[in-house]
Amino acid sequence: MSETSADADVDTTIDRSVIRSPHPDVEIPDVSLYDFLFASLDDDDRGRVALVDGPSGATTTYGELRDRVDAIAGAFAARGLGPGDVVALLSPNVPAFVAVFHGLLRAGITVTTINALASGREVAKQLGSSGAKALVTVSALLPAAEAGADAVGMAAADVVVLDGADGHPSLGELLAGGHAAPDVTFDPRTHLAVLPYSSGTTGLPKGVMLTHRNLVANVVQTEAYLPLTRDDVIPAVLPFFHIYGMTVLMNGAIYQRSALVTLPRFDLAEYLRVVEQHRATVLFVAPPIALALAKHPAAADRDLSSVRILMSGAAPFDEHLAEAVAGRLPGTRVLQGYGMSEMSPVSHVIPVDRTDISPGTVGLLVPNMLARVVDPATGEAIAQPERGVSAPGELLCAGPNVMVGYLADEQASRDTLEPDGFLHTGDIVTVDADGAFTVVDRLKELIKHKGYQVAPAELEALLLTHPEIADAAVIGVPDPESGEVPKAFVVRVEGSALTAVDVQDFVAEQVAPYKKVRVVEFVDAVPKSAAGKILRKELRAR
């Protein structure tokens, strides 16, 4: 994994079209993520609870966590892995995820996190694309892990199963060697820390190259508006493999020495039990969880009075839902943020002390961020108004948290990153005189299902492998519980008796559950432009 430039050369010439964060710039330490999070650990910190395993209640202190991180770094270095290597991590939210993630980074290894719901086919794609030399997983996900590893020729000895499985090394076996953490040095501005996969504004999933500085910067930027405390208790149900869970929950909590209660999956009853039993104070959620808290009768039967902040992200969160949540959680600040994997991920947050900003907005630019709003039809800049709200336009952002680019995809990188360092988000926004942004539409084709990204192009390519499908197109259609669901428009080959259930089953066997096609409509032809581009607007208008 080669090193590359992390901070874009953003043109800071005075320009009325450039919108700046109203918050003064914050200092970003020029250190590795490990040093940023763990170097200042003092004796008092060492005894504080860092992690609680939600199902069992087992605890890990900050001292134990750092010792485990160092030991894991030594174990993987002893296997010949270090700077320039990529290791994949396929795991739900368990305490070991945190230790392994930071142990790998401590050794200078780049981590590519894989969705815990991924199929074997999807695991293989990411292993191959990222060039991963090893895979770390848990026994519950071993079938997908083994299928993916076998497909790319990865040896069983390179598939580490944290809790043990026949034929694979376990974490305990790796740590038995007692190897000290390696002495590695690298430039945090250029050394790649993580490779999460994102579809960006369009197309197939791509490796997002994020440096140590990107991740450090975004923790500091977010903390300016959403300060956590040493006394906060945070249920961690949003997956750590997703950039939101990785940066805002995991790294943000460690930075402030808060306690994380890990939950491997979302189950409303279990989530409510954890909030009540552990007196949770801050909830980071996606809109489907917020909806459950607002509407489900089970939430009314629990004591949730300890919650002081609820922050929603990963998908649109309207003002009506925010009001419903606030009604169920009196005294709780209900906030919203915005971001994307390519920004590590946070670019906007409603500051916790700005009660004047509507929770239906995504808030203000975080410190050290610049933005432009551009008319997508003309390319003309739309200025922030002196009063009222601007016309809608595409949001572009620049800052120290913006990715280097996409792994091995120069064209996609050029399409997404402007030469002056501004990133195309593909989202249509307005901005008001106070600097609050509201997302009003999406240029990009991605489907947002329960906060997960679903790329239509990926499902279309899969559908076209079916021998009885002549052509196909996929769009997202509104769904009150999940935000959007994938709908497939399918052209059958002549004489085919293919049914909607056949199509749904074909896709379901090969993708993660959130990518399943939920609606199928058979059509005579898929509408396309003269250049062959699918006319999704026509499909949405049907």
Annotated model-derived regions:
Residues 1-60, 64-79, 83, 501, ...:
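N-lobe entry segment of adenylate-forming
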Residues 15, 58, 143-189, 199, ...:
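ANL superfamily adenylate-forming
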Residues 30, 47, 166, 179-197, ...:
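Conserved pre-ATP/AMP-binding loop-to-beta segment of ANL
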Residues 55-58, 73-121, 139, 453, ...:
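Conserved AMP-binding/adenylate-forming
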Residues 59-63, 193-217:
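Conserved AMP-binding A3 loop
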Residues 118, 135-137, 283, 399, ...:
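AMP-binding/adenylate-forming catalytic core of the ANL superfamily
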Residues 216-233, 241-282, 296:
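Conserved AMP-binding/adenylation subdomain of ANL enzymes
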Residues 280-284, 296-357, 370:
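Gly/Ser/Thr-rich phosphate-binding loop
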